[in-house]
Amino acid sequence: MASLRIAPFALFLFLAASVMFAVEKTEAGVIPCGESCVFIPCISTVIGCSCKNKVCYRNHIIAAEAKTMDEHILLCQSHEDCIAKGTGNFCAPFPDQDIKYGWCFRAESEGFMLKDHLKMSITN
């Protein structure tokens, strides 16, 4: 009777291990973007995907294929581009030197946070 209870669990572990090893064999070990973003935004934004032409692509692919900065709202060449577009205040370049555009981020340094914290009045 105990073996009947263990059999489904063993099958589950076998299937989980099979999926784990299958994913490791893909490029970079992660499931690539590719879902549609017609009605909802990209679900895979946590792994670096963004919507372009109603399909989710990796951010570095969007930047590498771009001919102008206007092709995506997060593309930039300087910090001023990000500020002007309103998409952040920091333009981060990609590690690949062949990609001429960077990606806009909203970044706040600890110095600004400390400065604001020191402005607070002390009440007793």
From Swiss-Prot:
Keywords: Disulfide bond, Knottin, Plant defense, Signal. It holds the Pfam family Albumin_I_a. Coiled coil: none annotated. The presence of a 'disulfide through disulfide knot' structurally defines this protein as a knottin. Probably participates in a plant defense mechanism. Belongs to the cyclotide family. Bracelet subfamily. This is Cyclotide cter-A.
